[in-house]
Amino acid sequence: MSLMTMNILLAFFISLMGMMMYRSHIMSSLLCLESMMLSLFMLATVLTLDMSFITMTIIPMTLLVFAACEAAIGLSLLVMVSNTYGLDYVQNLNLLQC
């Protein structure tokens, strides 16, 4: 395993730990999710280039599409919760179930 791959995996696990530690606020959770998706994108790109799989080049682009969708949905939930309750706590998401 190369040094670059280990650094990317370390970044993923650090952001996973951040997700576990700062899970009370939506904004902190979204930032940790975005860093996890970024490290997964970098890992998929590095592994695709290292293994010289031409057919696997669609996987990093698919990850970017999912990351953009996740960011849009997360930010819309953040705006809705903060406009409704004035706070960005994750526990307020349970109150949105009509």
Curated annotation (Swiss-Prot):
Domain of life per record: Eukaryota
Transmembrane segments: 1-21, 36-56, 58-78
Catalysed reaction equations from the record: a ubiquinone + NADH + 5 H(+)(in) = a ubiquinol + NAD(+) + 4 H(+)(out)
Protein name as it appears in the record: NADH-ubiquinone oxidoreductase chain 4L
EC number: 7.1.1.2
Transferase found in the keyword field: no
Location in or out of the cell: Mitochondrion inner membrane
Topology in membrane: Multi-pass membrane protein
